[in-house]
Amino acid sequence: MRVSAFALLAAAATAAATSVQGAAEGFAKGVTGGGSATPVYPTTTDELVSYLGDDEARVIVLTKTFDFRGTEGTTTAKGCSPWGTASGCQLAINKDGWCDNYQPDAPQTTITYDTAGMLGITVKSNKSLIGQGTAGVIKGKGIRIVNGAKNVIVQNIAITDINPQYVWGGDAITLNDVDMVWIDHVTTARIARQHIVLGTNACNRVTISNNYFNGVSDYSATCDGYHYWGLYLDGSNDMVTLQGNYIHHFSGRSPKVGGNTLLHAVNNYWYDSTGHAFEIAAGSSVLAEGNVFQNINAPVESSSLAGNLFTSPDSNTNKVCSSYLGHTCQLNAFGSSGSFNQADEGFLVNFKGKNVASADAYSAAQSVPNNAGQGKL
């Protein structure tokens, strides 16, 4: 019996749509998610929530848009305008008294927001959440991998439109008290606050790769259409690989690194920022190599720099990496961008013996905008 080439291609496409593609590099190397579990295909928001939150190992395939807006009604509450009252300025929800305690002089206002966006969908251990082509979208609500969850893969989905006008209106991806998590080929856009946040509890081993963090928005804390709240990595014992991501159109916190985070930022592409990319707090450590910074006003916020930073500044200095990472660190590249030149070496020993992502020359990162995000597997 002869099998047509079309049939073989169709079978391959189906297999690709129902299983994780590739494997995590870096700190989350070895993560398996739902493994070989029989794929399930939720059709309603309730089914999606149920599959993600149960105790079974699962491969969950999204074949449509799951729009959570309106599913939990709206909330009208007190808010404030700490960044101005122009039409492009984000407003702030008075969550946990934030306006009262931190912005008492800001103009007060009343806000009506979509309740579903405030708290993401809980994702438990041993899950693979994957999208089919470009069809898998979660709109109006993020995801939360928290409370001891382990061995989770999120790949090839989009998370969008979470109360974009209102700070404290919800985050796209939240990790807190987890281990072995891989976030890959995800697109995030029009988010209230953080596109991805690692909370103050230990998130341990995490790889964030090939994602498109899209900061274009009608509303921002800087009132200029550039989202400020990008990536916030603040765990107490975190090792994070940030690899091959397209980080576009942010005015700050892309990423903010704090807690006791060890971050390996490799072969990413930052493009178009009116503010800063890295913000590095005391106790955290960042190694950046093989990245491209194009039209980035400040690759690092120097006024607040209190942690460790190795920027792979020149070929001679970069040789020190080989003893700890197994390779000589790669130079970064800059176009119409600010200064990024620091060589703290003492923390590099923390990479020794760990799963460290490979690093290509910065020329490889030039292709990142075409390969990052949903539908680019």
UniProtKB/Swiss-Prot annotation:
**Top-level taxon:** Eukaryota
Q: According to the UniProt record, what class of enzyme is this?
A: lyase
The record's EC number reads: 4.2.2.10
Where does the signal peptide begin and end?
Answer: 1-17
GO cellular component terms?
extracellular region
Subcellular location, in the record's words?
A: Secreted
Per the Swiss-Prot or TrEMBL record, the active site comprises R253
Give each disulfide bond as a residue pair.
C80-C99, C89-C223, C321-C329
Note one Pfam family from the annotation: Pectate_lyase_4
Ordered alphabetically, the record's keywords are: Carbohydrate metabolism, Cell wall biogenesis/degradation, Disulfide bond, Glycoprotein, Lyase, Polysaccharide degradation, Secreted, Signal
The GO molecular function terms of this record are: pectate lyase activity; pectin lyase activity
Sorted alphabetically, which InterPro entries does this protein's record hold? Pec_lyase (IPR002022), Pectin_lyas_fold (IPR012334), Pectin_lyase_fold/virulence (IPR011050), PEL (IPR045032)
Q: Which SMART domains match?
A: Amb_all
Q: Which GO terms describe its biological process?
A: cell wall organization; pectin catabolic process
Q: Which reaction does it catalyse?
A: Eliminative cleavage of (1->4)-alpha-D-galacturonan methyl ester to give oligosaccharides with 4-deoxy-6-O-methyl-alpha-D-galact-4-enuronosyl groups at their non-reducing ends
Residues annotated as glycosylated are N126
* Gene3D superfamilies in alphabetical order: Single-stranded right-handed beta-helix, Pectin lyase-like
Q: Which family does it belong to?
A: Belongs to the polysaccharide lyase 1 family.
- Summarize the protein's role: Pectinolytic enzymes consist of four classes of enzymes: pectin lyase, polygalacturonase, pectin methylesterase and rhamnogalacturonase. Among pectinolytic enzymes, pectin lyase is the most important in depolymerization of pectin, since it cleaves internal glycosidic bonds of highly methylated pectins.
Looking up PANTHER family in the UniProt record yields:
PECTATE LYASE 18-RELATED, PECTIN LYASE A-RELATED
The name under which this protein is listed is: Probable pectin lyase D
Name of the coding gene: pelD
